[in-house]
Amino acid sequence: MRIKIDKNSDALYFRLDESRIVESEEIRPGVILDYDKDNRVIGVEFLGISQRATKEELSSLQFQTA
């Protein structure tokens, strides 16, 4: 898994798997899911991230495991 913040595009991208992306779908404005050949979600992109989170929130992402 990897996370990328692109300041130029104002986007945050979670990549869950390195499989080839075969389809993308905007499920709501500014939220795009990427799918592999088996229709599994392998990536999630948030556009306009500066409107969704503060710089402080983006600089210290926190993870929880269950």
Predicted regions: what they are:
Residues 1-66:
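Small, basic N-terminal interaction modules of short regulatory proteins
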